[in-house]
Amino acid sequence: MWEFKFYSRGGQGAVTAAKILINAAIIEGKYGQAIPSYGQERKGAPVYTYARIAEGPIDVKSYVYRPNCVICFDTSLADLGIDITEGVRPGSTLIVNTDDAAYENPAFEKVCVIDADKITHELLGEVGTV
């Protein structure tokens, strides 16, 4: 079973991203869960989202505490004391939204850097400025 933990801020789309990931897994014939964790947070507040993908039925009904993969939408969450390495398994993967192509984190075996903010601005212009 693959377990994912998404770190983001409200409004960045992590809850939607987890749902899309799980829908894609289901289309591929796998089982999946998307588990958002948020309350009255406003836009910009930290949000955690969890997901699981498995070949068979998933009996676990809890947050993800030992992720194989962490997806970080905003590296500035570290400034709030949020530790994206918490509970990661050996050999885990980090997918991180940053413009720092040399971004590294020794807690992860693989680090995949994606400048999603730049891609969004190139495709859509300034987001949220209607």
Locate the predicted segments by residue:
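Active-site cofactor/cluster-binding pocket
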Residues: 1-130
